[in-house]
Amino acid sequence: MAASSLLLLLLPWLVTALHSPPGCKIRITSKGLDLVKQEGLRFVEQELENITVSDLHGKEGQFHYNISQVKVLDLQLPFSNLHFQPQQHLVFNINNASISLRFRRQLLYWFFYDIGSINASADGVRIHTVLQLSKDETGRLKISNMTCNASIARMHAGFSGTLRKIYEFLSTFIITGMRYLLSQQICPALNHAGLVLLNSLLDTVPVRNYVDEHIGIDYSLLRDPTVSMDTLDLDFKGMFFYRGKENQELENHAVEPVIKETERMVYVAFSEYFFDSAMHSYFQAGVLAIELEGEKVSSTRSPRFAQAALCRQGPCGGGGEGRDAARPGGAGLCLQSREVLSRSSSHCWITTDSASSLQVPKDLEVLLRATFFGTIFMLNPAAVDAPLRLVLQVSAPPRCVIKPSGTSVSVSAFLNISLVPPGRPAVQLSSMAMETKLSAKVFLQGKALRVLLDLRRFRIYSKQSALESLALFSLQAPLKTLLQLTIMPIINERTKKGVQIPLPEGMDFTREVVTNHAGFLTVGADLHFSKGLREVIEKYRPAPTAPAHPTPQPEEPSVDPHQL
């Protein structure tokens, strides 16, 4: 009884563990499979043209014959079909194909010896292959098994020369043997093409890759692919991770994407979890902070440029001295005097260059000094001419909300305003909370998912009192303008680079259409091969290793009648 109760308690957890919702889902439809078939046929033709057939030799009474150097000249594959077969299979059929051959003949009859070439044709070739798809231990899509059956309905050869009648007499033995040998070589060639070469193509699909110096993306398959009569569905984890804690898992409580459409070649769906994990990872990396520092107020202004750094909370972005950020061994990258000063740690990063260094706009600086004029004199009158510093720090991981009406991102942050007297501790003037809502335009370009953000709502308020919040009302519009003109371009500079979608190399999206749903969005697109299968496979084919002992070259067929 106790065991049964324990099982009932564990059952919900077990069901959740067995069916973790995907953050990214890809559906390939029958239309997409038709395009794959066209490229696949070219690949199959190339593989069959390279098949090797063993020599055929024998004896019939006083006739000795030898058939060698069999070469495929041409293939005709007029009827082929590639379709889905539930539950995990792809079926590839070729019917009524023909294969043109040429081979070398040798014949000895008593003292008569003949040598030459023969053209032959195999007609009514039928090939039936079934590929089983599954995920391997690393979460990568693989062809795990393949069955193949090949048959040749008929084969004929044209003979000429003085011994033509003799060859026609022996044609039954020669043609029957050649048909058997040829049919036995078709399936091994296709098995190697599927289990070795096509799997090497699937190895180009990104599974766990680094996006930049801070985060990575996990595209491992959660389960084996689901195949219906018209579609193939792939469930990917679709989780970003902080590179400092690569094994940390972020629980997925988002709505599972559901793809119902079948009109386009391929559909890609992303849940809110996909975007939330990206922002959570950047938050963990400590890079969602920005610091702006103005010039010192004096009768003769310093000609130096303002510093600007986008870094984590620490010496560069967490309230330390502005010049401390330039010391060796610090934790960020800062712009000072139009130069980028490198730091030993990679936890801080900046997306602007020296030509676009950030600084507190003069109008905003004047407004801030006027707003906090009384506070400055009450706290430290001697610091009235000190440079002004603004530190904007995200206080919690941003959250993404996807609705049929659009996609938005909610961000909570705090803004610290302080004066930085040279050689003395900073004087904090105000610490205010900030809530913003960004609209997100998601689009697919090539094979990269890109996001363009725009500031929609903005609100600041004091963390100390409602009275101070009222006093900060005049700063609302200037600070919103600051975000729109200086900070949003920096963010979009990063998000427009995008992240790669898990597709093999050489395959791209075209004619993309994004559709929003409740809790997820889908991208419907067509497929395009920018590279052929053979080109990609040859690119990643491992270089052959030299054998320890020289491999003997195959011997040329004998021209000595006595060696027949």
Question: Could you tell me what each predicted segment is?
Answer:
Residues 2-102, 142, 152-318, 327, ...:
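Extended, low-charge, aliphatic-rich alpha-helical segments
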Residues 95, 100, 106, 113, ...:
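Well-ordered mid-protein domain cores that form the structural environment of catalytic cofactors
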